[in-house]
Amino acid sequence: MPYTTLGEYQIHYIHKGNGETLIIFPDNIHAAQAYEQEIAYFSANYSVIAFDYPGFGGSSHEQHHPDEIQVDYFGFRADLVCHLLVTHHIESCHVLGVGGGALAALHFAGNQAFQHQLKVRSLIADSFLADFDKRTLHRWLDTREHFYVRNIQRLETWHGNDWRMLLDRDTCFLRGLADRGGYAVPDKILNSISCPVLLTGHLRDAALPGLAREYARLSDLIPDCTLYLSGKSGHSYLERPFAWSDPSAFRLVADLFLERVTAK
């Protein structure tokens, strides 16, 4: 498995394919391995990189500088990707962010990439809210517990024997955010995203109430924004992201979007 050293962290990543770079920001509790099907699909046309956040998957499980992470949780992950790209001499990329990974991807496209002189060519953000009030964030975390119950073996494969401790640590931090009022991606970051953006999701996602209203709000803030919302989940477990619950529809929409972007 390929690794790269970024400061005090060993970062595990998966790299497959050739062409323009497409980097995947996993959902909070996922590892790069969780996106094997997306990697296999998009690597037919792109050089796909999916990585494990520090504390998850095959990356270092030690938690260094917790104060920095707590101050800028999603921005920290966005900054990490900048260093990963710079280390590999990659100057531009397309981005796919899922769930909590979409929040880090928004930070990356609207702030950190510019700071590191990286060009973001496009961004696909799937199944997320960029504004969690206290109640909604607690509810999202409650729903996430159902994913644990049905996927114990998978989570252990992704993260190792200490998977429960890692996920509980993430949940504890996010519960703290919720208790302090929730979390919202700042408008100035959304306003600063200069690349084309595609927001995807399904309207039956029980973990993301008011998704259509939230995406409409984001489309007013992001300069070049396209929406696709499915009327069905395609899967009985509604907390799954649209990219997984209806992969054929997601890939069709993503392909059309990327074709438009690359044709410019």
Can you annotate each of these PLM segments?
Residues 1-25, 45-46, 91, 252-264:
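Alpha/beta-hydrolase fold catalytic core
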Residues 9-63:
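Conserved HGGG/HGGXW glycine-rich cap/lid loop of the alpha/beta-hydrolase fold
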Residues 50-93:
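Active-site loop/oxyanion-hole signature of alpha/beta-hydrolase fold enzymes
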Residues 103-151:
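Flexible "cap/lid" loop of the alpha/beta hydrolase fold
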Residues 172-189:
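Active-site nucleophile elbow and catalytic-triad environment of alpha/beta-hydrolase enzymes
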Residues 193, 199-201:
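Short beta-strand/loop motif that positions the catalytic acidic residue
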Residues 206-214:
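Conserved alpha/beta-hydrolase "acid-adjacent" motif
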Residues 225-264:
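Catalytic active-site module of serine/aspartate enzymes centered on a nucleophile-bearing elbow/loop
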